[in-house]
């Protein structure tokens, strides 16, 4: 499944680039990432950075997170975050607006690992099944996550047991995503 997740993420990234080109005539732009180093940066303007996703030559390693929480992360989660650098990408899944989270740089990967660890520690304290977030939603208390046990993609309400299965796996979810330009 890991390689198929990488292919589905890459395919979505290409759809996102094409959608941006069709809507704006150029590469995606982001004002929040201006001045932050990344292999994704194509051009820095006065108020925005233009960027494109870049495949990692060497996949990122999650072993320190796994050791710290004494839990092996689902291979799809590792493939999703370890295979490319990219800015977050706005999208829709069956009419639901979301932002697909990505890793901008090595520094950003360190921050992501800290956030994943904090999320898993919170879930452990609440005696919930472990998940790892992959997207934010308009509701700041709801995130799209991958269940670490089943690989299901779910919509979960943070700090509660409220979960809704969206797809059986991450590959299917990524294939069904539609890019959106904000």
UniProtKB/Swiss-Prot annotation:
InterPro entries linked: Syd, Syd_sf
Membrane topology, from the record: Peripheral membrane protein
Record keywords, A-Z: Cell inner membrane, Cell membrane, Membrane
Keyword field contains Cell inner membrane: yes
Subcellular location: Cell inner membrane
Domain of life assignment: Bacteria
Residue ranges crossing the lipid bilayer per the database entry: none
A cellular component annotation (GO) from this entry: cytoplasmic side of plasma membrane
Gene3D superfamilies: Syd protein
Parts forming coiled coils: none
UniProt record similarity statement: Belongs to the Syd family.
Role: Interacts with the SecY protein in vivo. May bind preferentially to an uncomplexed state of SecY, thus functioning either as a chelating agent for excess SecY in the cell or as a regulatory factor that negatively controls the translocase function.
Protein name: Protein Syd
Taxonomic source organism: Vibrio cholerae serotype O1 (strain ATCC 39315 / El Tor Inaba N16961)
Gene giving rise to this polypeptide: syd
């Amino acid at each position: 499944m890991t390689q198929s997740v990488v292919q589905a993420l890459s395919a979505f990234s290409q759809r996102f680039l094409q959608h941006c080109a069709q809507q704006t005539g150029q590469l995606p732009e982001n004002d929040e990432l201006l001045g932050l180093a990344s292999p994704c940066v194509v051009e820095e303007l006065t108020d925005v950075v233009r960027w494109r996703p870049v495949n990692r030559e060497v996949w990122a390693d999650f072993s320190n997170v796994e050791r710290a929480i004494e839990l092996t992360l689902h291979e799809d989660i590792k493939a999703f975050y370890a295979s490319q650098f990219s800015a977050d990408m706005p999208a829709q899944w069956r009419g639901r607006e979301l932002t697909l989270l990505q890793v901008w740089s090595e520094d950003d990967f360190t921050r992501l690992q800290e956030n994943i660890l904090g999320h898993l520690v919170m879930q452990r304290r609440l005696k919930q099944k472990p998940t790892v977030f992959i997207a934010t939603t308009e509701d700041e208390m709801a995130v799209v996550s991958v269940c670490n046990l089943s690989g299901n993609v779910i919509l979960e309400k943070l700090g509660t047991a409220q979960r809704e299965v969206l797809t059986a796996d991450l590959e299917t979810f990524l294939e069904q995503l539609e890019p959106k330009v904000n």
